Every structure is written in structure tokens, then in C-alpha cells.
């Protein structure tokens, strides 16, 4: 079994604290639409890639991306206070397309419908 390394621990803390920060401290209504789906750290812990999803139309996705860019400095400062790391990683925000991709696959499977299993010949 693989042990959890420092990268994973720091990523988990950033995800947890950032989610709480969005819910409780940031007053931008655009970020209410966002859900943090994951954080990936570089090996040197200098960059945290934050992935988020937004349910809704394309316009909401764009607005949430803009809101993250505008709040970037505030978010980084607040996370630095909470995490107590020697070096606060640079935050990069990315839209997580896996949910949209999953919905697309699901709709295609629904269109196809259930597959009939081939009948076995009687002996």
C-alpha cells in the first residue's frame, strides 16, 4: 500500500482550507457556484494546481474563473495564515472538465439504451 506523501498531505490541506474559505470568507457570489474538486502539487511544492467545477452554463464557468483570478491574492494570503508552511505555493486555477465529460458519456449511453444480451441457443 502506498503511503501518503508530503505532496498529498499539503494538497489535501489546501483543498480543505480553500473550500472552507470559499464558503465562509469570500463574499464574491460568483464563487458560490464553484466546487473544489482537487489539488495537485508539484514535487517541489512550489505550485498548487487547483481544480474546480461549476454546474451550469458556459457563462458561469467563465465568471468563476475570473473571480478566482481577482481573489487570487486574498486566497493566497488567507491560505498562508491557515497552513503555516514555510513557503506558500503559487496557486493556479483550472476548470475540471471531467464532470462535463462524464455527463456527455452518460447522455450518449442513455441514447444508445440498454444492450440486449445475445440469446443462447437452446439445446
Swiss-Prot record:
What GO cellular component term, any one, is given?
cytosol
One example of the protein's molecular function in GO is: ribosomal small subunit binding
Q: Name one GO biological process term.
A: maturation of SSU-rRNA
Gene3D superfamilies in the record: 3.30.300.20
Which protein are we looking at? Answer: Ribosome-binding factor A
Pfam families linked: RBFA
Q: PROSITE patterns from the entry?
A: RBFA
Q: What does this protein do?
A: One of several proteins that assist in the late maturation steps of the functional core of the 30S ribosomal subunit. Associates with free 30S ribosomal subunits (but not with 30S subunits that are part of 70S ribosomes or polysomes). Required for efficient processing of 16S rRNA. May interact with the 5'-terminal helix region of 16S rRNA.
Similarity comment: Belongs to the RbfA family.
Q: Which organism is it from?
A: Desulfatibacillum aliphaticivorans
How this chain assembles, per its entry, is: Monomer. Binds 30S ribosomal subunits, but not 50S ribosomal subunits or 70S ribosomes.
This protein's source sits in the domain of life called Bacteria
Record keywords: Cytoplasm, Ribosome biogenesis
Which InterPro entries does the entry mention? KH_dom-like_a/b (IPR015946), RbfA (IPR000238), RbfA_dom_sf (IPR023799), Ribosome-bd_factorA_CS (IPR020053)
Task: Provide the protein's localization.
Answer: Cytoplasm
Does this UniProt record's set of keywords contain Cytoplasm?
yes
Amino acid at each position: 500500500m502506498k503511503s501518503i506523501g508530503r505532496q498529498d498531505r499539503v494538497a489535501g490541506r489546501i483543498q480543505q482550507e480553500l473550500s472552507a474559505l470559499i464558503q465562509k470568507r469570500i463574499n464574491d457570489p460568483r464563487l458560490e457556484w464553484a466546487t473544489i474538486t482537487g489539488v495537485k502539487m508539484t514535487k517541489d511544492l512550489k505550485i498548487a494546481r487547483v481544480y474546480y467545477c461549476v454546474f451550469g452554463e458556459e457563462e458561469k464557468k467563465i465568471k468563476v474563473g475570473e473571480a478566482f483570478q481577482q481573489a487570487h491574492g486574498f486566497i493566497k494570503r488567507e491560505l498562508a495564515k491557515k497552513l503555516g508552511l514555510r513557503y506558500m505555493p503559487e496557486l493556479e486555477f483550472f476548470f475540471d472538465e471531467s464532470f462535463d465529460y462524464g455527463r456527455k458519456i452518460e447522455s450518449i449511453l442513455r441514447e444508445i439504451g440498454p444492450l440486449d444480451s445475445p440469446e443462447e441457443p437452446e439445446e
